[in-house]
Amino acid sequence: MKRIVRTAGLSIAAVSLMAGATACGSGGSGGSGGSDDSGTGGGAGFDPIAALRTAEKSTDGADSAKVESTTTMGSVMSMTADGVLAWGDGLTGNLIITYTGGTMADTMRQMGSTSMEARYLPDAYYAKMGDTFAEQSGGKHWIKYAYDDLETLGGGSGAYLKDQMQNTTPNQSVKLLLASGDVRKVGEETVRGQETTHYSGRVDVADLAEKNSSLSRSQLDDLKKTLDQAGVTTETVDIWVDDQDLLVKKVEKGETTAGAYSQTAYYSDYGTDVSVEEPPAADTADFTELVKQ
C-alpha cells in the first residue's frame, strides 16, 4: 500500500507539472480546434502573420498573467488549473490544480483530496500532496521535480519537458501558429466581454519541437518515438487576441492513444504580481529518491 500511494502521488504530480507547461505554453496532440463564440471570416488583404507577430511580442513582454484552464484526456483525466504565472525569468508561479474526472480523479480521492497546489520555480517544480501521501513518505507533503533530473531520467521527452518548463510563455501558442505556416483569421469574436480576433491553424508537434527547442538530434529522435507511441502527430491551435495584442484565450484539441485531448486556457490581468516561495526543505521529498523506494 505504501508503495502504491507513493507511485500514485508521483504520477499525479508529474501530470500536474505538464499542466503548467500547457497552460502557459502549448503541448498536446492532434485534432480540430474550436470555440463556443461565433465569428466571421477575415477580410481580403488582411495579413494574419503580421498580426500574430505583434501579438507574440506583446504577450511575451507582459511577463505575467492570471491563468484559468481546463484539460481533458480521454478517460484518464479531466482537470482545472487556476492561478498566476510569470515568465520574465523562467516559468514561475502558483496553480491550484483540481482533478474533476477520469482515473486520475479516482486516484486522488483515494489519497484524500482531488486538489493540489503546484509551485513553479526557474529550476524546479513542487507539488503539494495530501496527508495520506505524507503518511507514506516520511511525513513530507511536497514532491520536488528538478528540471535537470527530468532530462536525466526522461530521455528525449524529459529533455523536451525541461526545455518547455524553462522557456515556455503564453506566446508559445502564437509562435506555434507562426512556425506552422498554416494559420488563418477566423473572425472577430467576444470572449468574456472582450472584443477579440480569432486565429486558427494546424501544427505538427514533432516538427515544431525541432524548430522551437534546444534539443539535440538524439533527444529529438527519442521525443518523436515517444510522441508516435502516444499517438501524437498534429494538433489544432486556436487563439483569441484582444485590441492590446494580448492573448486572452487558447484552445488546443487532438487525439492520443489515451483518447481525445483538449485544453482551454484563459489569460487576464497581464503584469500581475507573482510571488513564489520554495517549500520548506524538511517537508519536501525529491522525486528521484521516491522512485528508488
PLM regions: where:
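Bacterial N-terminal signal peptides that target proteins for export
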Residues: 1-13
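Subset-of-secretome marker
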Residues: 3-6, 25-293
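Extended, amphipathic alpha-helical scaffolds
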Residues: 15-17
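C-terminal motif of bacterial Sec signal peptides marking the signal peptidase cleavage site
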Residues: 19-23
